[in-house]
């Protein structure tokens, strides 16, 4: 038994200069696990509750001392003495202790910090890597990175409405090669933007945030960068979009404020169909609002066989919402964010449910990150095949990529790379 002897939480800083929760779990054998909790900028209405203090005189109301106190004063006494190897039992105990459907009492940020730190402590106690502890001997698939190299929407102060324009080096044969490809395209894009006299300042997730004339210009600019880096769009590298359409949805329509255009659901679907026909786009995330279920279904019927349609705000890593999507054949992929649901157990349940239904699962960071690289281990542990964790820029993003390089190195000849097989539900 790896008995928990102490749990301690503190307030630390995330990559946007906002407070977040860090938790340490100590075991009887001297092992310790530490975890930091991420935070999102564009958040779905159905996400688990991130507890903030609301005291405007301190960190503009964004302090997390209440969540820290909940760990130290409420959760710790309940879990001390439990076996850290009983991840499900520990997570269920915290869910029951909270007693709300959305973790609104203790805070998902408090509960998740403990959940991840317990897993890290257990892995250290057993002397195995975290991905191996979580996934077992078959945890060996390195994910295709979904690299956000151009930012708009809530992730940047510019005129681009679509939140993220990403590259996916699907044609690479290893994670190391995929990361190099993405990094070379990133530097190529910086040069392309500089030659056009555009800003090369970066947004929350490390991507550039230039003022472009349209969302389509963002796509063509990235294609120029891919070619300039020596890669072939549609063969070596594909594009992925995160529209974050819920942020645009007002009064039943979608408002592209940067372009000064308003679109209906039907016009949005036609817009995506046109983009997919013109450009090598392999994935579209949150193409419609989180409550536009009929629209999502129509979008899936139209494009679901050839494009990955990822539900982030739609599914919020929640098995109940995912089950509704599966039952109605809505979307074909789930974005997995640990802090949307609040425990590792529930995160793994969502991934398993998606895979059993033939949906893909994309493991994801948040825009507010830390040096914590747990999601890298989760991606390998679940053989998810895809990870979304920003540009190859900013330490809070690169920390995840560096951990994946270490894992690939450690797995050596047994490592596999997701590549095109990561999109197992699309017709070639």
From Swiss-Prot:
It catalyses: (2R)-2-phosphoglycerate = phosphoenolpyruvate + H2O. It is an enzyme of class 4 (lyase). Keywords: Cytoplasm, Glycolysis, Lyase, Magnesium, Metal-binding, Secreted. The keyword Ubl conjugation does not apply. (2R)-2-phosphoglycerate binds at residues 163, 337, 366-367, 388. Its EC number is 4.2.1.11. Disulfide bonds: none annotated. Mg(2+) binds at residues 242, 285, 312. GO terms for biological process: glycolytic process. GO terms for cellular component: cell surface; extracellular region; phosphopyruvate hydratase complex. PROSITE patterns: ENOLASE. Binds a second Mg(2+) ion via substrate during catalysis. Its cofactor is Mg(2+). Coiled coil: none annotated. Pathway: Carbohydrate degradation; glycolysis; pyruvate from D-glyceraldehyde 3-phosphate: step 4/5. The active site is at residues 205, 337. It is found in: Cytoplasm; Secreted; Cell surface. InterPro entries: Enolase, Enolase-like_C_sf, Enolase-like_N, Enolase_C, Enolase_CS, Enolase_N. The keyword NADP does not apply. Catalyzes the reversible conversion of 2-phosphoglycerate (2-PG) into phosphoenolpyruvate (PEP). It is essential for the degradation of carbohydrates via glycolysis. Belongs to the enolase family. This is Enolase. It comes from Brevibacillus brevis (strain 47 / JCM 6285 / NBRC 100599).
């Amino acid at each position: 038994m790896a008995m928990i002897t102490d749990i301690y939480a503190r307030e630390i800083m995330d990559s946007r200069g906002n407070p977040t929760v860090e938790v340490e779990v100590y075991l009887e054998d001297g092992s310790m696990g530490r975890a930091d909790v991420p935070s999102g900028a564009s958040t779905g209405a159905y996400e688990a509750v991130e507890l903030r203090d609301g005291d405007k005189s301190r960190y503009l109301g964004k302090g997390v001392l209440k969540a820290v106190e909940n760990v130290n004063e409420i959760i710790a006494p309940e879990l001390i003495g439990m076996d850290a190897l009983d991840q499900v039992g520990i997570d269920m105990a915290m869910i029951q202790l909270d007693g709300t459907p959305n973790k609104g009492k203790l805070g998902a940020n408090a509960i998740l910090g403990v959940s991840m730190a317990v897993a890290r402590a257990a892995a250290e106690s057993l002397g195995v890597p975290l991905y191996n502890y979580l996934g077992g001997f078959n945890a060996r698939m390195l994910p295709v990175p979904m690299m956000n190299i151009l930012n708009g929407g809530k992730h940047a102060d510019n005129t681009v409405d679509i939140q993220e324009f990403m590259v996916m080096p699907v044609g690479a044969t290893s994670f190391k090669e995929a990361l190099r490809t993405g990094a070379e395209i990133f530097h190529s894009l910086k040069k392309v933007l500089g030659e056009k006299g555009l800003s090369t300042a970066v947004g929350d997730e490390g991507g550039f945030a230039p003022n472009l004339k349209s969302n389509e210009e963002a796509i063509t600019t990235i294609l120029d960068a891919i070619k300039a880096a020596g890669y072939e769009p549609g063969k070596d590298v594909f594009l992925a979009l995160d529209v974050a359409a819920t942020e645009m949805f007002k009064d039943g329509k979608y408002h592209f404020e940067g372009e000064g255009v308003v679109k209906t659901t039907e016009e949005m679907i036609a817009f995506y169909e046109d983009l997919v026909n013109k450009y090598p786009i392999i994935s579209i995330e949150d193409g419609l609002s989180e409550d536009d279920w009929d629209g999502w279904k129509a979008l899936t019927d139209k494009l679901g066989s050839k494009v990955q349609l990822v539900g982030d705000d739609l599914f919020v890593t929640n098995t109940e919402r995912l089950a509704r999507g599966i039952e109605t054949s809505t979307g074909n992929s789930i974005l997995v964010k640990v802090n949307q649901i609040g425990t590792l157990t529930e995160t793994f349940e969502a991934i398993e449910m998606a895979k059993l239904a033939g949906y893909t699962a994309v493991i994801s960071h948040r825009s507010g990150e830390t040096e914590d690289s747990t999601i890298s281990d989760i991606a390998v542990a679940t053989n998810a095949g895809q990870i979304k964790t920003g540009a190859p820029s900013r330490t809070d993003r690169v920390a995840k990529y560096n951990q994946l390089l270490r894992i690939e190195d450690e797995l050596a000849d047994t490592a596999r790379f997701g590549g095109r097989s990561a999109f197992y539900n699309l017709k070639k």
